[in-house]
């Protein structure tokens, strides 16, 4: 009899644990995965922050993973999120080509994929959210033209590109050249990549200055590289306009301090929030657009 009571007691405890476990499962929030190319860049930190605020508001658990600019780590991150059972994947690709196979990992599990800021050149993408990078490049060029409208030239220009192969690199450069190449007084003396990295931007700019210090304009495909370029320019004592792209806080502070000249300001927090908003709509069976544009503006002193 005493043994039967013990068996009954253990059985009751197991039933309570199982009920508790099932209850916890019901209370769990649906998970959205977010894979960012790097969190060593204020732009993507702001994107993460915007997504987290929107996820909290809408009742989702946002799982954010950092690819550290490594396509192999990016794929591993997505594989982990697939195993976790996310209801949607927000991804900012390290590279538009390299990410294709990674997108297909999510596709095989029927997980909707939303790309942020940079496009994927393949795989099934449910929606893409970004600033109009071509338009942003054109805005940078129009700003330069306005600044030099009364000068005959030649005006020497340096372009510091982002990661080769990234859609943002391609589109920002295309937009810039759409305008600049129509005006003969501008002379591109150097076009080099610095991978959206501040330290590489500094090193690239130092090398360019050593080869030819006669520079009037620098257009960098993001603020991190522009800030690196500014450091090299200050050290060399030359006077040049430096235009970045993103509108991060460090760039705005540099502009306010009369170091950088301007930046094409994005709204990364909005891009992140829109990603979660679209994931929520997909989860609830609502239709969405395949492309969403976030507004840009020129920030200058």
Residue ranges and their predicted role:
Residues 160-168, 179-180, 267-301:
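Hinge/cleft segment of the Venus flytrap/periplasmic-binding protein
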Residues 88, 96-135, 154-156, 248-261:
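Flexible loop/hinge segments that line or gate small-molecule binding clefts
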Residues 1-31, 61, 104-111, 287:
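Short, low-complexity disordered leader/linker segments with a strong preference
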Residues 43-60, 136-143, 167-186, 200, ...:
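Short, solvent-exposed amphipathic alpha-helices that sit
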Residues 32, 74, 129-155, 200-202, ...:
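Hydrophobic alpha-helical segments within soluble ligand-binding/sensing domains
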């Amino acid at each position: 009899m005493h043994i039967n009571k013990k068996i009954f007691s253990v059985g009751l405890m197991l039933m309570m644990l199982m009920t508790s476990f099932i209850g916890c499962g019901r209370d769990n929030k649906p998970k959205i995965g977010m894979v960012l190319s790097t969190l060593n860049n204020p732009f993507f930190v702001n994107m993460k922050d915007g997504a987290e605020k929107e996820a909290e508001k809408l009742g989702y658990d946002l799982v954010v993973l950092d690819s550290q600019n490594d396509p192999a780590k990016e794929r591993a991150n997505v594989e982990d999120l697939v195993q976790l059972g996310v209801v949607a994947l927000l991804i900012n690709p390290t590279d538009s080509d390299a990410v294709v196979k990674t997108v297909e990992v999510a596709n095989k599990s029927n997980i909707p994929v939303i790309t942020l800021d940079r496009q994927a050149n393949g795989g099934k993408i449910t929606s893409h959210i970004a600033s109009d990078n071509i338009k942003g490049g054109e805005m940078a060029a129009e700003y330069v033209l306005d600044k030099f409208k009364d000068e005959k030239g030649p005006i020497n220009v340096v372009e510091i590109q982002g990661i080769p192969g990234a859609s943002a690199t391609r589109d920002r450069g295309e937009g810039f050249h759409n305008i600049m190449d129509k005006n003969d007084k501008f002379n591109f003396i150097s076009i080099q990549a610095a991978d959206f990295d501040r330290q590489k931007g500094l090193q690239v700019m130092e090398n360019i200055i050593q080869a030819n210090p006669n520079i009037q304009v620098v257009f960098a495909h993001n603020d991190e590289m522009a800030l690196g370029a500014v450091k090299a320019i200050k050290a060399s004592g030359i006077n040049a306009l430096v235009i970045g792209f993103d509108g991060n806080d460090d760039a705005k502070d540099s502009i306010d301090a009369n170091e950088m000249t301007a930046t094409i300001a994005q709204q990364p927090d909005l891009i992140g929030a829109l990603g979660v908003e679209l994931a929520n709509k997909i989860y609830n069976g609502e239709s969405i657009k395949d492309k969403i544009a976030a507004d840009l503006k020129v920030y200058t002193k």
